[in-house]
UniProtKB/Swiss-Prot annotation:
It catalyses: cutin + H2O = cutin monomers. The keyword Disulfide bond applies. This is Probable cutinase 2. The keyword Disulfide bond applies.
Amino acid sequence: MNLRLLTLALAAVAAASPVDIQERQLSGGNELRDGSCKPITFIFARASTEPGLLGISTGPAVCNGLKMAKAGQVACQGVGPKYTADLASNALPENTSPAAIQEAQDLFQQAVTKCPDTQIVAGGYSQGTAVMDDSIKRLPDNVKEKIKGVVLFGYTRNAQEHGQIANFPKDKVKVYCAVGDMVCDGTLIVGPAHFTYLGNTGEATQFLLGKLSASSSSSSSSGSSDTSSASTSAAADSSSSSSSSSSPFGNLGNLFGGL
């Protein structure tokens, strides 16, 4: 791979994808570390050479979409500064650096420890997809369970991982690979198709919102079921107690199957 050409290409897409001042301010990027707990935590790893913690393209777009849909309920956290989003790390065995993988794992762990009631959604773009893949598959089960959905744009490990994240539910992952994006075919060849994913951020946001909604509905149903079971159990205990008190043999009748 020609790293110089890749650098020029990524610089060009950065210049072609401006984010206005209001959007930059809305995006934040270090809100898990520095802010208060929110019902939803979005953790994102940017593409190579993108500045900031969320980057300047797909990361802020999804963050802002979540915040507009769930006003006041979302904390957005980018992976960095140990994840430097340098070009050379793409050529490493895991397609990113060990430091980046560990930092992402630490952020997921921090979200669960600091904010035990938060629901986590995540995403990555280009090298950032490798950061997500390599970190999530190594997490303990109790942390994975808190992650409700993951969106991956230009998945650099798509071929190696067969379009999913190892050791993680496939239905929680949405991969966006544009036609002609050779990065998704297991190469490090970057062409124009790799810079088209802003057009997928609206759909990706809806995917994450759907996973959050499904999780909330499941929790509500579980709570209702538990309440109903408790009520039924209490009623049965009350009935049993009433029957026992009216019998001269108390609970002895139960020893014979109610005969």
